[in-house]
A protein has these predicted regions:
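Donor-nucleotide binding loops and adjacent catalytic segments primarily
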Residues: 169-247
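Short gly/ser/thr-rich secondary-structure transition/capping motifs
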Residues: 110-117, 160-167, 235-238
Length: 247
């Protein structure tokens, strides 16, 4: 008997960054532990992290760049899903272009539609919606955007964290600042990491450790390497699996 499947529709790249994919990989690991066969549908965007999906052992279905229209994106995704529709238990969508119009068209073949969102700026046709961000009145942000039957997982208690964070020891109160952790996401498109390092450099303050985490495909990576040599105790990290140890 063939295993039941869970599909993820998510992208990564130089423009989108890596956060959408990384949080989906965390959720995918949980489905894998429950013996589901996990599939990812991804656009082949510039700077993508599809290789990371392969490393995790999940199945990948690449679709050509559909940046022209969401309609093309939907049609290509639907064609892939149709091949597995008798086995699909859940479709997880982490993509700001998708909305109620396209999600609803998959109702006939998908038992459970699971949306991961941050924006609360469009309606969804889904069974579960996850938004772990802490906003003012976060409990009410989606009241008019989903049906009353939808299970809402809202707020920081639902944040998707890698297992390494659950084994971290509770730390004592810090009396003096000795260690700085800098990360603005894998891509850091607006180059905030370098701005912070320049500020530290101008301040002439000294710290025991200054740890900067970025993705290797970050377009400012060489600049970061260069400035890190000018400031004492700065280390640049990328694509690491133990980020909690640096925090």
């Amino acid at each position: 008997m063939k295993r039941k499947c869970v599909f993820f529709r998510v992208d990564s790249g130089n423009v989108l960054g890596f956060g959408h994919l990384n949080r989906c990989l965390i959720l995918a690991d949980e489905f894998k532990m429950e013996n589901f066969e996990v599939h990812f549908i991804c656009q082949n965007l510039e700077g993508n992290l599809i290789k990371n999906i392969r490393k995790c052992g999940f199945k990948i279905h690449q679709i050509r760049n559909s940046n022209d229209t969401i309609t093309n994106d939907f049609q290509k995704t639907k064609q892939i899903l149709e091949k597995f529709q008798d086995r699909i238990s859940c479709l997880v969508i982490d993509n700001y272009r998708w909305n109620k119009k396209y999600e609803g068209k998959l109702r006939s073949m998908i038992k459970c539609i699971f949306i991961i969102d941050d924006l609360a700026n469009r309606k969804h046709d889904c069974d579960i919606l996850l938004d772990p961000n802490l906003y003012t009145n976060f409990e009410k942000r989606y009241e008019k955007l989903v049906s009353k039957k939808c299970m809402l997982l809202l707020g920081p208690k639902y944040i998707l964290l890698r297992k390494e964070f659950f084994s971290c020891k509770k730390r004592k109160k810090i009396e003096k600042l000795k260690k700085i952790f800098i990360s603005f996401g894998g891509q850091d498109c607006s180059n905030q990491s370098i701005k912070v390092l320049n500020g530290i450099h101008r301040s002439k303050l000294e710290f025991g450790e200054i740890n900067v985490v970025v993705g290797k495909s970050n377009k400012f990576f060489k600049q970061l390497r260069k400035i890190s040599k000018q400031i004492k105790n700065v280390k640049i990290f990328s694509d690491i699996n133990n980020i909690s140890c640096l925090m």
